[in-house]
UniProtKB/Swiss-Prot annotation:
Location in the cell: Cytoplasm
GO BP annotations listed: ribosomal small subunit biogenesis
A single MF term (Gene Ontology): GTPase activity
Cofactor(s), names only, from the UniProt record: Zn(2+)
Enzyme Commission code: 3.6.1.-
Subunit-structure text: Monomer. Associates with 30S ribosomal subunit, binds 16S rRNA.
Principal place of residence: cytoplasm
Organism: Synechocystis sp. (strain ATCC 27184 / PCC 6803 / Kazusa)
Keyword terms, alphabetized: Cytoplasm, GTP-binding, Hydrolase, Metal-binding, Nucleotide-binding, Ribosome biogenesis, RNA-binding, rRNA-binding, Zinc
UniProt domain CP-type G: residue ranges: 88-246
Full protein name: Small ribosomal subunit biogenesis GTPase RsgA
GO cellular component: cytoplasm
Length: 369
C-alpha cells in the first residue's frame, strides 16, 4: 500500500525529532522521525531542509482552498522523513540548510557598538558566501550625527546598513522588504534586540526577551536553538543563539577576500608574489591605506595560529589568548578540567526523565512503522 506523503520544510530540530511545516497542512507543524534507511546512509536532517514526509494514517490531506477544512494533526501522530532534497547552501555553525542571506543585527548603543566585534562578525558572515544585510538597531537612543557617522564609515567598508528602531518601529519596513520570500539567518551579539526584533517581524511568536546586563553592559544569551519562523509576507527567518566572538574558520589566503574594500582593490590586478599575505610585501596590490587593515592583520595572525596549534602559547604555557573589545590580545590562565566530577542527583533524575519520554516516542514510532 502506497503511503500518503507531502513535502515541507524542517523548521526545528530537537534531539532525533524534527518539526516540519508541510505544504498542505497549515494549522501546525508535524513532529517527524527520520527513516532508518536515511540513518544507514548517514543522511543528516538540518533546519531549512526541504523534505518529503510519509504521513501518519490519521492525517487526512485536503487541497488548498478557502472552503476546505483545515487539516489537523492529532496529538501523538508522528510523520517520517523519507527523503531530503539537495541543498543549495549549507552552514555548519549554526546548522542551517538552504539559507539565502544573513541579517547581522547590531545596536548603535546599549551595548556600545564595538568596531572590532562588528568587523569580526562581518568577516565570518562573508565566509559563508551568503548575501549580507547589516542592520543597526536602537536608532531612538542616539543622535542623528551618530547615525551618519556609522553610515558613512560602513559605506567605506563596503556596506549599506539599515537603520531601525524596534522601540518605535522606525525603519522596520525596509528590513521586511529585504527578508521577503527568502530564507534568512539572523545573527549578532547578545543584547542588541534580536529577539525583540523577531517578535516585531513575526507577530505572535513567543521569544524570551531579557534585559541587557547593567553590570557588564553585555547582553545575556536568550536564544538557545535554531528555529525557522514564518514571516507574514512570505519567507522564513532563523534566529540563532547569541555569541560574542564568532570563530574565524577560514584559510589565510582567503581572509583578504572577506574584506569588501580590499577585495575591490584586487579586482583587475594581482600582487607580485602569488602567496602574498598582504603584510607589507613588495608590490602588494592591496596596500595598507585602508581603515580595517589593522583588523585584517590581527585576524590573520589568529588564523595562522589556528593552523599551527603546536606553536601556540596555549600549548606551551598553559595560557589562553583572548581578544579584547579594542582588538588587543591578552593572556589568561586556562582552568583545570574537572575530570572526576560526579553527576548530581538532580542531573541523574533529569536524564532518567528524558529517557522515559524518548522511550514513549520510540514506541509510537514502532507502532507507525
Amino acid at each position: 500500500m502506497t503511503k500518503a506523503t507531502d513535502e515541507g520544510t524542517v523548521i526545528a530540530v530537537q534531539a532525533n525529532y524534527y518539526w516540519v511545516r508541510l505544504r498542505n497542512v497549515t494549522s501546525q507543524p508535524l513532529l517527524c522521525t527520520r527513516r532508518t534507511r536515511l540513518k544507514k546512509v548517514g543522511q543528516k536532517v538540518m533546519v531549512g531542509d526541504q523534505v518529503r514526509v510519509e504521513l501518519p494514517p490519521s492525517l487526512l490531506l485536503h487541497g488548498r482552498s478557502n472552503t476546505a477544512p483545515v487539516p489537523m494533526v492529532a496529538e501523538g501522530d508522528l510523520g517520517a522523513i523519507a527523503k531530503v532534497y539537495p541543498r543549495r547552501t549549507v552552514l555548519e555553525r549554526p546548522p542551517v540548510a538552504n539559507a539565502e542571506q544573513i541579517c547581522l543585527v547590531f545596536a548603535l548603543t546599549d551595548p556600545p557598538l564595538e568596531e572590532w566585534q562588528l568587523s569580526r562578525f562581518l568577516v565570518q558572515a562573508e565566509a559563508t558566501g551568503l548575501e549580507i544585510s547589516l542592520c543597526f538597531n536602537k536608532q531612538d537612543l542616539v543622535q542623528e550625527t551618530d547615525v551618519k557617522f556609522w553610515g558613512d564609515r560602513l559605506a567605506a567598508w563596503g556596506y549599506a546598513p539599515i537603520i531601525i528602531s524596534v522601540e518605535n518601529r522606525w525603519g522596520v519596513e525596509k528590513l521586511q522588504e529585504k527578508l521577503r520570500s527568502r530564507i534568512s539567518l539572523m545573527a549578532g551579539p547578545s543584547g542588541v534586540g534580536k529577539s525583540s526584533l523577531i517578535n516585531l517581524l513575526v507577530p505572535g511568536v513567543e521569544q524570551q526577551v531579557k534585559n541587557v546586563s547593567g553590570k557588564l553592559r553585555k547582553g545575556r544569551h536568550t536564544t538557545r536553538h535554531v528555529e525557522l519562523f514564518d514571516l507574514p509576507h512570505g519567507g522564513l527567518l532563523a534566529d540563532t543563539p547569541g555569541f560574542n566572538q564568532p570563530d574565524l574558520a577560514v584559510e589565510p589566503a582567503q581572509l583578504i577576500h572577506l574584506f569588501p574594500e580590499a577585495r575591490q582593490q584586487l579586482t583587475g590586478q594581482e600582487c607580485f608574489f602569488k602567496d602574498c599575505l598582504h603584510r607589507g610585501e613588495p608590490d602588494c596590490a592591496v596596500g595598507q591605506d585602508w581603515e580595517r587593515y589593522e583588523h585584517y592583520l590581527t585576524f590573520l595572525e589568529e588564523v595562522l595560529a589556528q593552523q599551527n596549534p603546536e606553536n601556540s602559547r596555549e600549548t606551551d604555557t598553559g595560557l589562553k589568548t583572548k581578544t579584547g573589545s579594542d582588538g588587543q590580545e591578552y593572556d589568561e590562565p586556562k582552568l583545570e578540567t574537572k575530570k572526576y566530577r560526579r553527576h548530581s542527583r538532580r542531573q541523574e533524575h533529569q536524564e532518567l526523565q528524558s529517557f522515559c519520554e524518548q522511550t514513549d516516542l520510540d514506541n509510537l514510532q514502532e507502532d507507525w512503522e
